[in-house]
Amino acid sequence: MSSGNTSSQNHSPVNNQPTRLKSPLPALHKDTQPNTSHQATNVLQAIEHARHFLPAQGPISVFVHHNTLHAFEDLPFEKAVIEGGRRFGCEPYLSEERYHQELLRGRISREDLREVLMADLQDDADKLVATFGTRYTLRLSMLQTELQPMPESGLSWVLAESELLKRFREEVPAPYREKTITQTRGWVMRHLEPITTDTTSSNPASPLPAPLQDRLKAAGESQIHRWNDQQWESFTLHALWETCQQGVEKAEVQTPNTASNDSLHRLMRGELGIDLKTKIDDVLIRFCGCFLDQGFADWKLPERENGFAKAFADLYLGRWAIRADWMKHVDASLREVQSPDWDAIQSIEQSLERMGISNNECEGFLSECLLSLRGWAGMIWQMETNGPFLANPIPEGSLNEYLAIRLILLAHAIEHFGKAKFNVGTASEILRLALKSADVRSASSVRSRTHTVFQLAQLGGWTPEQMLNMSSAQWRCLITEIESFASLDRRRLLHAAYERHYANQALDAISIHSRRRRELATNSRRRPAYAAIFCIDDREESFRRHLEEVAPDCRTASAAGFFAVAMYYQGADHASFRPLCPAIVKPQHYVREEPLFSSMAAGERRAVRRRRLGWFAHQVHQNSRTLIGGWVTGLFGAIATVPMVARILAPRLTSQIRESMGSLVRPPATELHLERLADAPGSDPASMGYSLDEMSQIVVRILQDIGMVDAFPPIIVFFGHGSGSLNNPHESAYNCGACSGGRGGPNARAFAVMANDPRVRRRVAEQGIELPDEVRFVGAYHNTCNDDVDYYDLDLLPRSLRELFRRIESDVIETRARNAHERARRFESAPLDLTPQEALEHVEERAEDLSQARPEYNHATNALVTVGRRDWSRGLFMDRRAFVTEYDPTVDDENGHILTRILQAAIPVCGGISLEYYFSTVDVEGYGCGSKLPHNVASMVGVMTGAASDLRPGLSQQMVEIHEPMRILFVIETTPEMLKKIISENEGIRRMVEGNWVQLAILDPSTYTIQRYIDGHFEPHVVTDREIPTVQSSMHWYRGQRDHLGFATIQESEIKTPVSSSESDANTSEVLV
């Protein structure tokens, strides 16, 4: 059996796609009988270690962004992507072709390549390579042009049918091309022998290779003198090829044979011609879907409460069970599963012994088996351990039972299909014989090496004469050097250059802009007209920026979007509680939205009506699948297509009609059950909510985090955020990450209620923050998909503040249109000449379009996190690519407690979002979930591709198609000493920072100078760009553009008087003229 070379990645000659890294097979020994005595402890430890590699994504309704390679965070990023790629069969970086496209369009510069290569080589940069200069110059040449690997099987066709030996590559500089042709022509003419009539022999004394002599003889001496430029170019390339091939043969560099290191399933597929994995997966996919079902299926799986294994055995031992032929002898094993004393771990031990898997191979083998259906296996583990509020929880031990059943099926499949070829009946003997017969092949060939050297010779201006004069030792040195810098190493450095380019642009822009802001010497402590507090989400960056342009006298700030209100929340229309806090936090408090006391009876009647309607709709859905229901659906089903077609052809109009009909019966006014009467929190009515002391701690924490401890404006609006769209199974992934994929409106509302309570304010004052009586907090919800904004509890706003609130409302309306206009430029279906109001209508339509696969782009393009005062980043156009986190060093203490708690959330959360986007972009099929278009919801817990596949964790193609995969860059306003202290004292932060999973820089609070964190120490950032553009408004910078944009300074607007909504729309449209 052949095995791929995992040290580098080559492009296929057909589709030019990178070869996938393969996962290792446990080292099953061919010639020795392994020790297969397994102890339960060893098996449990092996399972515990193997399950770390399973996806950590829970049910899709609570989608939480996280580092896809979380199991490898103890390794540096550069090693982790290789190990993860090998284990999961995925790509660690973009393809070389993609990086070179970025090089050609200027996204990577030659200077970036030189800097990252020099940093990588260090003292080895000046090592000489044959006669072609240094290691640095050779590798730089290899980085600057895409080397197109070609296997032996494809070279014959390319040599015969393409222009490989007729035209130089387009990337070859013209001077190199002319020099090579001219020098080759002179070399040939100097050694041109008189043409003889004997064309069957070559002159051994001639320095020209024999094939070139034959070519010259075939042309004839008189014709050679009349060759044009194209003919000499072709001859030069033939000469270059022949000398390269001769040199490769002369070098005699041996490629070590690689032992079979493939997976067991690929081994058996190669030996038997049958994919055992597919056979087993077909059985388990359907059963896992039934077992994990959360209400999607019509029938409940029998015996589900008895566990995975017993339910499986009962189902497949049933009288009407339908089984594949290879499962006909599995009855005895399944009957053992039905016995009361059956144990999953003992069953796993027996299966390992049956297949001859030794103790040393146990962990790797079990890991391979779990990862065979890693989506389903990961979901079983997540629902077993992290599913307290599932409608249908699963029993403890389900993952072990899943593995036990899989191994039983695998052993039977090996014996069933292997017996015919190897004429033995035991799984262990079949595996031993299969390994013995596996082929071992060499990883490289003479002609494929020749092709690589041939490409470098063109790019480097190496002449045939120069290469013909090289010794065998020099050729060995050259080939060894080339092969030591394989595709994977080149992609690693190309990616480093890709990241460096953006990081330098970002740090230059922040340095220049912060200096400009400092020169303005504005007083940040003056009392603003009002304040707007947002989540740190990158989608809110543009909303904040536009609001600041519309209302220069307002102040904006940001904090994690759960606003320190960690709770299990149940809305008035929700069937159950759900967590609204970061995934790393386990809430202790329960909050419920309830009708006002005066509307309790109306609320109860509405709840009864909703339950009845829900029951009726469920019955209609269920009965439509029966025989009679099918007839009825066939007769009257066409009527149901009317609203569906309307949602596709006129989604916005359909939405308005639906909302108008819904307004006929408005829901009653509600309030939050927020104050707790009991001593301890819980889910019963008396235990719901927070104590007054807990409320005051939450208010103090957020006000300190955002640096708002004095000069309070009359109204402070807290904007939670979420996203709403149709036909989008991943909708929770578009919601607030700080709320575990929930919507942050209830958190903003709860915070506002807490901060407005006079009893809470008295306790806050005791901690040093005086909130004046006239200051009011308002909760709001921003829908990032359609840019709609809703406000909570406005009836509680004093009449004296209503005029100011109307001004806020007007500013927000204009901001919505401007923000939608900036967002719409990224949508191909939105013309670039839309007015802001038309853009707002466009995004509203996208959110209601049943056929829309891209309602919004979510966190796509995220690349930067700023942690510091808004003073130095206000007015900086960051293209919706930055998480903007508020932090005021002057409010913090000498130990940095405020910064520590901010970074404890920001680095794992923002880093996790960035890394999930990174991995889903570099391999959207392996780490991501592919295209949304063939997805089907499975069991209400995830999506499958088509009718039956593994669950697809990760992000879809439509979510990452405009993303640039980079490790996120943190720019933190603090000192080196403070940040080093925080890193050393916090393991989670230390692992992410020292492992290079995130990039780090600091902005000095006093001097605004920037230093980068590199290999454990800080280095000053040298600004290369002295200026960045200054524009009148954001629209003046981005209009007419669809691609990523650079940084720019937005001119500070003068404070304007309030304008009406219609006037604001007209003024906004005027800017685009």
Swiss-Prot record:
Which superkingdom heads the taxonomic lineage of this protein's source?
Bacteria
**What is the originating organism of this protein?**
Rhodopirellula baltica (strain DSM 10527 / NCIMB 13988 / SH1)
Q: How does it sit in the membrane?
A: Peripheral membrane protein
Localization terms from the record:
Cell inner membrane
Spell out the protein name for this chain: Probable inorganic carbon transporter subunit DabA 2
Q: Where is this region: Disordered?
A: 1-35
Q: How does it assemble?
A: Forms a complex with DabB.
Keyword Cell inner membrane in annotation: yes
- Any one of the GO CC terms: plasma membrane
Q: Give binding positions for Zn(2+).
A: C535, D537, H721, C736
Q: Which cofactor does it need?
A: Zn(2+)
Identify the keywords attached in UniProt to this record, alphabetized. Cell inner membrane, Cell membrane, Membrane, Metal-binding, Transport, Zinc
Q: Which GO terms describe its molecular function?
A: zinc ion binding
- Function recorded in the entry: Part of an energy-coupled inorganic carbon pump.
